[in-house]
């Protein structure tokens, strides 16, 4: 009954109309059925989730956010660390750059340019010399060198590039030279520079925080060390700042992250930018982990280091390693795997992921085709165990503008219309794709587990084979053929069942030594003939 007829009927007989509305439901296209149909949200990275939580905690504690300098001249390391500076600089990355060489234009080079088929006039030579002078002085960036050389010689960019490669190889062979600028290895380097500029511009106390990258030249990266990490650092600046401020800030910050109960222990490292005896490690107890873990360090900046920047206030600094906290909160054992799961992490596809990538290959595309598919399934279900030889009419009538006659048959003697495997349903369990029969008599251990714990894809062998038969009949009618017979015998692989699996899932199953076991006897035959 059509929708408008149901609405009309409801005015006379609501109950009957309501029941009829249930009959109007059509089975959706295979790709619009669960678990193929899936609505997913984007996934955030655990590291940035942790940064956001720490950032929110600082803001709730009344701290204002700041971005500290990332590029630090080595002079600041000496001012902050004193005689300890060389050891600190050993773990710093120095920035290097390519030098700007003097590039001469001798007779030999001019001849080489002319040999490349480029006309060289006095004006062009003068323009080229000016380009190289600007490059040497730094007025011209390396990005624009090819373009400017091409303009000077009045040639296309690809010819200008050939000139640079063949005539001026010294540009290609340049080696980087290090300067005095380092990448920030710890947030303290940036805090001293920032506080130097603002300590006398605001009312005390100052409560500031910064969450940003630091870089440390570790001997190697391992499960607990990366060469770049995030520091969630804060400072409290006032005329007088007791060490207990660090304890209170640590407590307020870490309680927001789910930690409870805190222990404070003197840090044995004793960095020279802290007042002796103030550098303190913070240990916190996490109820979910049920253990004590080190999560932060704080201390009071040394008046000697502060005096190097003209700062006469007292400063408490607390630092939290974001990766460390993220590992604790997510119970990760390897920081590389946590930060770079795409490189170090184990490749995992859930059964749900695989189910989304498994689908019927050939599926009817028209409403007539989908109707015929349902009739094939209905006929098979009704007569699957009929003794052969046998034949049953599936449909006789109009189909895509032509009259057809469709039958389900088995011509061999002493068998049945269908093989027993047609009743199987496809399950996915622990990465294995399995054909699970309706009965339990022949279950293997793997099939038993799949039946209890696996994901039912909703795909039956019968429906997959019926979909292919209906699709082939659509093809027959559209192409003008007179007859088609679709027969399936033994299922050994996905293609035997008219199923397809995306390459990603296939690589995963193969790489993880999982199984695709869909074997079974099918022996189904559908025949279609045109009738005018």
From Swiss-Prot:
<comment type="function">
    <text>Catalyzes the attachment of O-phosphoserine (Sep) to tRNA(Cys).</text>
</comment>
<dbReference type="InterPro" id="IPR006195">
    <property type="entry name" value="aa-tRNA-synth_II"/>
</dbReference>
<dbReference type="InterPro" id="IPR041590">
    <property type="entry name" value="SepRS_C"/>
</dbReference>
<keyword id="KW-0067">ATP-binding</keyword>
<feature type="binding site">
    <location>
        <begin position="231"/>
        <end position="233"/>
    </location>
    <ligand>
        <name>substrate</name>
    </ligand>
</feature>
<keyword id="KW-0648">Protein biosynthesis</keyword>
<feature type="binding site">
    <location>
        <begin position="186"/>
        <end position="188"/>
    </location>
    <ligand>
        <name>substrate</name>
    </ligand>
</feature>
<keyword id="KW-0436">Ligase</keyword>
<dbReference type="GO" id="GO:0043039">
    <property type="term" value="P:tRNA aminoacylation"/>
</dbReference>
<dbReference type="GO" id="GO:0000049">
    <property type="term" value="F:tRNA binding"/>
</dbReference>
<feature type="binding site">
    <location>
        <position position="317"/>
    </location>
    <ligand>
        <name>substrate</name>
    </ligand>
</feature>
<dbReference type="InterPro" id="IPR005246">
    <property type="entry name" value="O-Pseryl-tRNA(Cys)_ligase"/>
</dbReference>
<keyword id="KW-0547">Nucleotide-binding</keyword>
<dbReference type="Pfam" id="PF18006">
    <property type="entry name" value="SepRS_C"/>
</dbReference>
<dbReference type="InterPro" id="IPR002319">
    <property type="entry name" value="Phenylalanyl-tRNA_Synthase"/>
</dbReference>
<feature type="binding site">
    <location>
        <begin position="273"/>
        <end position="274"/>
    </location>
    <ligand>
        <name>substrate</name>
    </ligand>
</feature>
<protein>
    <recommendedName>
        <fullName>O-phosphoserine--tRNA(Cys) ligase</fullName>
        <ecNumber>6.1.1.27</ecNumber>
    </recommendedName>
</protein>
<dbReference type="GO" id="GO:0005524">
    <property type="term" value="F:ATP binding"/>
</dbReference>
<keyword id="KW-0030">Aminoacyl-tRNA synthetase</keyword>
<dbReference type="GO" id="GO:0006412">
    <property type="term" value="P:translation"/>
</dbReference>
<dbReference type="Pfam" id="PF01409">
    <property type="entry name" value="tRNA-synt_2d"/>
</dbReference>
<comment type="subunit">
    <text>Homotetramer. Interacts with SepCysS.</text>
</comment>
<comment type="similarity">
    <text>Belongs to the class-II aminoacyl-tRNA synthetase family. O-phosphoseryl-tRNA(Cys) synthetase subfamily.</text>
</comment>
<dbReference type="InterPro" id="IPR045864">
    <property type="entry name" value="aa-tRNA-synth_II/BPL/LPL"/>
</dbReference>
<dbReference type="GO" id="GO:0043816">
    <property type="term" value="F:phosphoserine-tRNA(Cys) ligase activity"/>
</dbReference>
